[in-house]
């Protein structure tokens, strides 16, 4: 039996010329010549480029099946791998047999025709869009970045912690959470006050889908020293923008005996490592993005990989913005959060490279961030990148129980719900720090695909959960 190879193996020169191979995949296009030949472009997802299958009318099923192949049909081809005579390809397969595995019903209505489709249209056929050049390339880049993240942290001595999806804690304190319940919606139990009685629910209390794994991973940080979580998070935020998803993935490292400077260094090392990796491992996909989606994206990745990030405090950033001649849509004032236009000005115009802004006013940051000695700012950091703005947000955590309690009171958080988190400050507390990186935002930045709905397999957004 002939060995089955991927198209990537065939095109990468791993197989000797004139060796008989079997490949499997889906038809992208087929064209016929008057000389009794069919040229089939076949892809299997293993790399960006398809491989050409040359079929002659000597095949037993040539007229009955081969000439009826259309885009989307699945097939198995066996034949000799030879040097290609055509332009733009080094190898092709001279078919000795073709087996049609699956036909496309009604080819005229098949959604993924051999033409360029808008990303908006492809969201309507999310189950078929991985068959397109753009989405398959995004998927391979997503894979390489995910693998690189795990590899980076493993090499740095971190342990991957699987934090829970279902939680009773709101890390962000914003309240935009999806409730998890098995209560009968037609017969909801009530307590003496007429409120929903969550003690009758599955977990015996009110529970939600997690908005972040940070609080949980902090617990493991207090025993394992260097940990990270990489998993799905959920926000019930009714935002229909190119930057928001209701379900997305987060990378959240946490380091014990660490301060703000430590995570600033870690974030820079990680981003530089990821940019180098994707350029090395996904060169063909990045060439596609650079040519057809976001010209200059390769140069941008090279720039980040080679740059020393700029550092500035929030206060200095505000001064620089106020001193600039740029007209901003949103006001600039100490105490207000930086908007995307401010972030991009700092990274693209002022610094012309990634910049890490530190020490933000406590009022605009999370309750868990460490209060600085000035009593006004917290030891927070945001990494701002040219072309996108904020890509990483983090902080040194508040390890002093009395100050953490005060911040929770100021944020109107119920301390009873955070008893276990407060315990971490009671039993062997240490300075510790971490950050969060939205995975989809990273992929969007790397590929230049501007809408995060197009870099996750099945996007979850307000009004959309069809698959």
Swiss-Prot record:
Query: What's a Pfam family this protein contains?
Result: tRNA-synt_2
Query: Which sequence ranges form a coiled-coil region, renumbered to this chain?
Result: none
What does it catalyze? tRNA(Asn) + L-asparagine + ATP = L-asparaginyl-tRNA(Asn) + AMP + diphosphate + H(+)
Q: Does the keyword Membrane apply?
A: no
Report which superkingdom the organism of origin falls in.
Answer: Bacteria
Q: Name one GO molecular function term.
A: asparagine-tRNA ligase activity
What EC number(s) does this enzyme carry?
Answer: 6.1.1.22
Give the GO cellular component terms, alphabetically.
cytoplasm
GO biological process: one example? asparaginyl-tRNA aminoacylation
Q: Where in the cell is it found?
A: Cytoplasm
Q: Which keywords does this Swiss-Prot/TrEMBL entry list?
A: Aminoacyl-tRNA synthetase, ATP-binding, Cytoplasm, Ligase, Nucleotide-binding, Protein biosynthesis
Concerning InterPro entries, the annotation shows: Aa-tRNA-synt_II, aa-tRNA-synth_II, aa-tRNA-synth_II/BPL/LPL, Asn-tRNA-ligase, Asp/Asn-tRNA-synth_IIb, NA-bd_OB-fold, NA-bd_OB_tRNA
Q: How does it assemble?
A: Homodimer.
Q: Which PANTHER family match?
A: ASPARAGINE--TRNA LIGASE, MITOCHONDRIAL-RELATED (PTHR22594:SF34), ASPARTYL/LYSYL-TRNA SYNTHETASE (PTHR22594)
Family membership noted in the UniProt record: Belongs to the class-II aminoacyl-tRNA synthetase family.
Protein known as:
Asparagine--tRNA ligase
State the organism of origin: Legionella pneumophila (strain Corby)
